[in-house]
Each structure stands twice: as C-alpha cells, then as structure tokens.
UniProtKB/Swiss-Prot annotation:
The lineage of its organism: Eukaryota, Metazoa, Chordata, Craniata, Vertebrata. It comes from the Eukaryota. Residues 552-562 have a biased composition (Low complexity). The keyword Cytoplasm applies. This is Interferon-induced GTP-binding protein Mx2. Residues 60-333 form the Dynamin-type G domain. GO terms for biological process: defense response to virus; innate immune response; negative regulation of viral genome replication; response to bacterium; response to type I interferon; response to virus. It comes from Mus musculus (Mouse). It is found in: Cytoplasm. CDD domains: DLP_1. Residues 171-174 are annotated as: G3 motif. Residues 1-18 have a biased composition (Polar residues). One of its GO terms (molecular function) is GTP binding.
Length: 655
C-alpha cells in the first residue's frame, strides 16, 4: 500500500505545464522549487513504486493514488485541473460518469507532449492537450452510453510531457441525491457504491472537495470519507469557490479551514480555481493561479489563511507533498507484507495446478505415468494409515477404527441383555425343550437356541457398518482423485467411474462374506481348552460375587432358586460362550471389511489405473485440461515472477 509513483500528485500538482497552461516565469520558478523538493524527498520512493508498477504488480496489489470526491458540481474537476495542469470535461450535472484515472508521466526536456485515452480495448492516441476533453467525453459515451448514466469501468488518461509530474489522480463521479431526467432511479446509490470502492482502500488519499458556500455539516462527501477513514489519516478537506461566499459568512469559512467546525485529523485547505465563466472567457491556468494569489492576498478575511499556508493551489500542492511522503513511509512495510503474502498464496495455488502438460507424445506418456504413480502412492498411504492430513482432520484408518469400536460396543449391547429378559428367555426355552433331564442338568438345545438368536440379531448391524465404511473409503479415494486429477476432467471422470465400479463389486463380495460368517456362527463351536478356560473364568467371577453377597445382604429367593437349578448352569455357559463369540465376531467382521473394502479395493483401483497406460491413443484425451487451467497456470507463473522481483526490489530499498 505504497503511494504509487502516480500518487505524487501532491507535489507534482504544482508542476503545472508551462507550455500547455501558459505559466509565467515567476510561476514556473515557484513550481521548479517545489519540484526540486519533490525530487529530493519523494523521488526515491516514487521510483520504487514506478518500478513495481512497471513490473505489473498493480495487477496483484493496489498501488495507491489520490482520489478526488465531492458533491455534484463541487469543483472537483477544477481542483484536478489545478493540480495536474490537464483540462478535463466540465459543466453542470454529472460530468464525470466513469472513474477517470489520470496518469501523468514526466519526460526528459525536449521530448514532445503525448497523450493516450484507453478504455475497454480501445486506445486513442493524442497529440495535443486540447484533444483531451473530447476524447474523454467519447470514452464516457462509449462506456456509459450517451446520456446521464454512470459506469464503474475505468477510463485511463495517460499524459507524458517534460512539464508534468509523475502522479496518478482519480476523478470520481459527483455525489447526487435525486435522479434527474433519464437518470436511473437509484443513480445516487450507484454513485456512492462506486466511490466507496475507491476511497475505502487504505492505499488511497482522499481529497474531499466542498464548496465554501455550503453547510459543511450536510456534505455527503465528507460523511462518506469519515465512514471509511474515521481517524482522518487519509482525508484532506478542500474548500472551493471562496469567491461565492455570502457576505457576513466569511468568518465561518475561516473556522472550517482552521478545523474548528467539522474536525478532520489532517485538516483543510482552500483554493480558488477557474470557474465556468473563466473558461468561457478563456482565462488561462497561469492567469487563474495569479488571480487566486491576488484574491487571497487582498481578501480581508481569507488572507489570514494564506498566511497560515492553508490557501492557494501551490500551498495545497506543497501540503500534499508532505502528506505523500508520510503516507509512503507508512505504506512501505504494509506493501512488503502484502507482496510476501500474495507470493505465498500464488505459490500454493500454482501447486494445485501442477506442471505444464508436455507437447511431445512420448513425454505426455511419462507425464501421465507420473500422475498415476502419484495417485497410487497416495492410495497406498491411505490404506497403510500414513497419509498427510491437515490440522484438525484425522486419517482414514482413524475414522475406520471409530466405526469398528462402535461395532464392538453394539455386540456388547446385544449380549448384555437385562437379567430379567434373559431369565424369561431361558425359562421359555426350558419349558419348550426340556426332556427327560432331571433338575440340574443343562438342556443343550436351550443353550444353542439362545446363542443363535442373539448372534443372528447382529447380522444386519454388521451389514450397516459395511455400508458406512464403504462410503468413508469411497469418499477418501475420490478425494485423492480430486487432488491429483481435478484439472484433467477426463482422467478424473474415468477414475471416478472405475472407483464406483470396483466399489460395487467389493461391497457385494464383502457382504457375501459377512453373511457367510454369520451362517457359520449358527454352528455353536469353540475349542475345548478355550471354552473350558472361559467357563472357569465365569464360574470364578460368580463365586467371588457370591462371597461379596454373603458378607452383605442375603440373596433373593429367586437367586437361591437359580443356584439350585439348571438355570444357573445355563447362565454360566451362555456367558462363557458369548465372551468368545464377542471376541471372534468383533474382530472377524472388521477384518472382512478391511480386506475387501480397503486392501482389495485399493489394489484393484491401482491396477485399473495402470491399465490406462496401455492405451497410448487415449493419453492426450486423458490429459485434456479444464478450459482455463492452462491460462491460470500461466497467470500464476507470471504473477509469481512479478512478486518475486518486487520482493527483491523492496529488499534493496534503503528506506
């Protein structure tokens, strides 16, 4: 946010072109003194910004200028004319209908004046200052239409001459409140929105132009400036038309300029520029400057402002010089940070677009091989739980473990039925299947049926977990495809198609395997030594619990009945078998899912991607980029080159 070379406005403003404006020798001598001060104090900073602008850094960052705003017919154009020495369109109503960027370039002595008006793709070369006004009017009619409409499109006026300073000025449409004639009903809102886009930039010095003969408290331009610059660090008030002040109100104007009415941190200046009558009478800019000096020197109320250095265009220019120097010094560190951040951002964005696609067919094949290998490596990292993840995110395997843990808890929940429910089930089976056994003998049929029923209820939750995990893996694999192939829509689309086909097949195989496992679980079996150990552990735990019960309250009659019947024995066997079934199912189902949905899914996808290389004719088709990818990559490379050079030049700057 450095004030661009073009922002030299302040100083240069005084450097009125004698050839074009007819300045006298004394006026030119005064101007030359100011320019000497400008060269010594501001030129190094301006040269730096000029070099950045020559690099094209302005495409990436705002290099500030001076914006002139004011109510309609406040005298904005007159102030610009006085500061720059360039005659601009004038008149009543909306004169400035497009933002006008006035870029002045100082040439060496002896070089001829030249100008250029640019808008859209049109460039109009100018050979004489008198052609400027007509060219700008044509540009405004072309952009905003013939009439009173406005546009936010820029018109650029470049003026190169030995007698102008290096500076940039922006003339914005005058603020209006009521639509007139063919103006759009919301013309006022349009203009304010347009002005705000410029004056809110920290890189812009706002010159707020206010006629001396209006109540400053009601000025819309000052209110807008204060809204975007509440501390007044970038705002200078400029009072115009002091010759139109009503008699008896002069002291109020003096109070305003002395910052006693509507406070601005940077205060006010007052100038008297050429009016419409002066233009009609063909008063030259030189004569206007002389008349201004005489007016303030002889005015009984305003001459004190001249003595304070707050009146006349030369004083305004000198003030702007000082403000510009200060603003540049404040802006340089911020500009350096902006360039650094923009460089980093562009580097990160360029990485997303990857390398340029080779033109040679054989090189294209190698390029495709590299892209597919990178994709396959990322898939391998996912499967092995070694992928890189952003802060706050978790790896694929971490998410799968959460699902598997939920599955284990689902089994526990199913097996841990309430005592009363299980007691009723056991009694129901005892009544149904008990044969000739005497009390105390375990009915194996009862035991088998209860186990089978409980395990069967886990089958559908297992299938639901399979679908959940499959979707998680599919999304993860798709993200890898987007990361590697997003700019190659045919390759990305082909990968997604393969991915979906393989997913359906693997999910189907995994489901068949899980259902087969649950069919096998209907066979009640466990290794003898394992089952004995589990049963022994259950009995020991119950014995320990019984000891605690005897030391405390007496057990219920229901519990005592169980201890003396086959019910106690059945409960012990149920608990023992369920522990082993839990261990087996909670591990085996996730193993099936990992094998089919993670391992085999990944392997088949990787092989399918490598098979794409067998079709040499499809290489170019697969590597076809998005329509704007190549342009974006080129743009980012150019941007990085500009910003890298800008950083080097800033690093060498002595300030």
């Amino acid at each position: 946010m450095v004030l661009s070379t073009e922002e030299n406005t302040g100083v240069d403003s005084v450097n009125l072109p004698s050839g074009e404006t007819g300045l006298g020798e004394k006026d030119q001598e005064s101007v030359n003194n100011l320019c000497s001060q400008y060269e010594e104090k501001v030129r190094p900073c301006i040269d730096l910004i000029d070099s950045l602008r020559a690099l094209g850094v302005e495409q990436d960052l705002a290099l500030p200028a001076i914006a002139v705003i004011g109510d309609q017919s406040s005298g904005k154009s007159s102030v610009l004319e006085a500061l720059s020495g360039v005659a601009l369109p004038r008149g009543s109503g909306i004169v400035t209908r497009c933002p006008l960027v006035l870029k002045l370039r100082k040439l060496n002595e002896g070089e001829e004046w030249r100008g250029k008006v640019s808008y859209d793709d049109i460039e109009v070369e100018l050979s004489d200052p008198s052609e400027v006004e007509e060219a700008i009017n044509k540009g405004q009619n072309f952009i905003a239409g013939v009439g009173l409409g406005i546009s936010d499109k820029l018109i650029s006026l470049d003026v190169s001459s030995p007698n102008v300073p290096d500076l940039t000025l922006i003339d914005l449409p005058g603020i209006t409140r009521v639509a007139v004639g063919n103006q759009p009903a919301d013309i006022g809102r349009q203009i304010k929105r347009l002005i705000k886009t410029y004056i809110q930039k920290q890189e812009t010095i706002n010159l707020v132009v206010v006629p001396s003969n209006v109540d400053i408290a009601t000025t819309e331009a000052l209110s807008m400036a204060q809204e975007v610059d509440p501390e007044g660090d970038r705002t200078i008030g400029i009072l115009t038309k002091p010759d139109l002040v009503d008699r008896g109100t002069e002291d109020k104007v003096v109070d305003v300029v002395r910052n006693l009415v509507y406070h601005l941190k940077k205060g006010y200046m007052i100038v008297k520029c050429r009016g419409q009558q002066d233009i009609q009478e063909q008063l030259s800019l030189t004569e206007a400057l002389q008349n201004e000096q005489i007016f303030f020197k002889e005015h009984p109320h305003f001459r004190v402002l001249l003595e304070d250095g707050k009146a006349t265009v030369p004083c305004l220019a000198e003030r702007l010089t000082a403000e510009l120097i200060s603003h540049i010094c404040k802006s340089l560190p911020l500009l350096e940070n902006q360039i650094k951040e923009s460089h980093q951002s562009a580097s990160e964005e360029l990485q997303k677009y990857g390398m340029d696609i080779p033109e040679d067919d054989s090189e294209k094949t190698f390029f495709l091989i590299e892209k597919i290998n990178a994709f396959n490596q990322d898939i391998t990292a996912l499967v092995q739980g070694e992928e890189n993840v952003a802060e706050g995110e978790c790896r694929l395997f971490t998410r799968l473990r959460k699902e598997f843990l939920s599955w284990s808890k689902e089994i526990e929940k199913n097996f841990a039925k309430g005592y009363a429910v299980l007691y009723n089930e056991v009694w129901a089976f005892e009544k149904q299947y008990r044969g000739r056994e005497l009390p105390g003998f375990v009915n194996y049929k009862t035991f088998e049926n209860i186990i089978r029923r409980q395990i069967k209820t886990l089958e559908e939750p297992a299938i639901e977990m399979l679908h959940t995990v499959t979707e998680i893996v599919r999304a993860a694999f798709t993200s890898v495809s987007e990361k590697n192939f997003s700019e190659f829509y045919n390759l990305h689309r082909t990968t997604k198609s393969k991915l979906e086909d393989i997913r359906l097949e693997q999910e189907k195989e995994a489901e068949m395997s899980i259902r087969l496992h649950f069919k096998m679980e209907q066979i009640i079996y466990c290794q003898d030594q394992i089952y004995r150990g589990a049963l022994q552990k259950v009995r020991e735990e119950e014995a320990e619990e019984e000891k605690k019960t005897k030391h405390g309250t007496s057990s219920s009659s229901q519990s005592q009945d169980l201890q003396t019947s086959s019910m106690a024995e059945i409960f012990q066997h149920l608990n023992a078998y369920r522990q082993e079934a839990h261990n087996r199912i909670s591990s085996h189902v996730p193993l099936i899912i990992q094998y089919f949905i993670l391992k085999m899914f990944a392997e088949r996808l990787q092989k399918g991607m490598l098979q794409l290389l067998q079709d040499k004719d499809s290489c170019s088709w697969l590597l076809k980029e998005q329509s704007d990818t190549s342009e974006k990559r080129k743009f980012l490379k150019e941007r990085l080159a500009r910003l890298a050079q800008a950083r080097r030049r800033l690093a060498k700057f002595p300030g």
